[in-house]
């Protein structure tokens, strides 16, 4: 997993509540178990019409937002069904962090496990950032995990909280599999003790 220290880039404003995982990565793109190759599916039904042509009104198709690195969203972002592809689609598109007022809980956890930083800010702060992003298309912000701050387009800093353990794993680029492998000896020792002390569980 790629370590996350900070991300600086263009803001992609998703100016509505309850953007669900079916919108983030529609079902027809869920034909793979691979992490790669999902960039085209990111917000696919919003980006393309029934003929596969780009919808010009979609922010993802507007020149100012090309190369965006940070999604700015409102309430309950990533709600709906559990699909890890929703996180992979963000990453495939080039998104490094999300700033939102709240998240679907499963999506939030999947983000942390895959190195996509989900920052939660008060709704009022999100509204301020959203107004700036919409007024100045293509403006940028910075998400700094070391200092736990979002730096808005105008230079204002917005502090955020994150679980200390998850923060450290993100900073080190360590996922749950890496963590388990690092503790393989301890796990094996526990299994041997358990087999000896509780053989009926074997």
Swiss-Prot record:
Which superkingdom heads the taxonomic lineage of this protein's source? Bacteria
Q: In which pathway does it act?
A: Amino-acid biosynthesis; L-leucine biosynthesis; L-leucine from 3-methyl-2-oxobutanoate: step 2/4
Q: GO molecular function, one example?
A: 3-isopropylmalate dehydratase activity
Pfam families assigned to the protein according to its UniProt record, in alphabetical order: Aconitase_C (PF00694)
Q: Which UniProt keywords apply?
A: Amino-acid biosynthesis, Branched-chain amino acid biosynthesis, Leucine biosynthesis, Lyase
Tell me if Lyase is a UniProt keyword of this record. yes
Supply the InterPro entries for this chain: 3-IsopropMal_deHydase_ssu, Aconitase/3IPM_dehydase_swvl, AconitaseA/IPMdHydase_ssu_swvl, IPMI_Swivel, LeuD
* Disulfide bond positions: none
The EC number(s) given in the record are 4.2.1.33
* Catalyzed reactions: (2R,3S)-3-isopropylmalate = (2S)-2-isopropylmalate
Any single biological process term in GO:
L-leucine biosynthetic process
- Identify the GO cellular component terms for this protein: 3-isopropylmalate dehydratase complex
Q: Which CDD domains match?
A: IPMI_Swivel
Report quaternary structure and partners. Heterodimer of LeuC and LeuD.
| Known function | Catalyzes the isomerization between 2-isopropylmalate and 3-isopropylmalate, via the formation of 2-isopropylmaleate.
- HAMAP family in the cross-refs: LeuD_type1
Annotated family: Belongs to the LeuD family. LeuD type 1 subfamily.
**What is the name of the protein in this document?**
3-isopropylmalate dehydratase small subunit 1
The root-end lineage is: Bacteria, Pseudomonadati, Pseudomonadota, Betaproteobacteria, Burkholderiales
